[in-house]
Amino acid sequence: MTVRMLHVLGSPVLRQQAARVAAVDDEVRRLVDDLFETMRAAKGVGLAANQIGVAQRVAVVDVGEEDPPPLALINPQIVERREEVQTAEEGCLSIPDIFGDVERHARVVVAALDVQGQPFRVEAHGYKARAIQHEIDHLDGILFLDHLSAV
């Protein structure tokens, strides 16, 4: 596992739509390991591959809850959203020292592949749902700043 360099606001890869992973292999598993290592070293709760310069649809989330445990999401897709939304402050490892209130769905169901290439679904509420939506936005080239209303 390697701690990778974080790309910050202004890096073109952060605005790229990440490519789907064709096959989950050892290279993708190493990427997942590096994402977890980099996220933890930076004291984050989520990280998308394009934040370390890799434009593939891979993200990790660990908000410190045991159920579900830390998540590796390969080719994640939100398949269900609760209409109810919640507004809370967000920040981003790629946008240091800037925070803002972002409205997100309170509950989401995500379909993805695990590190063995097996499909799974996860239902997330609250903070975990927020973190997952934030990371999937990254994979679509969207930053939390894009959700902020002009003041």
Model-derived segments and spans:
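Positively charged
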Residues: 1-151
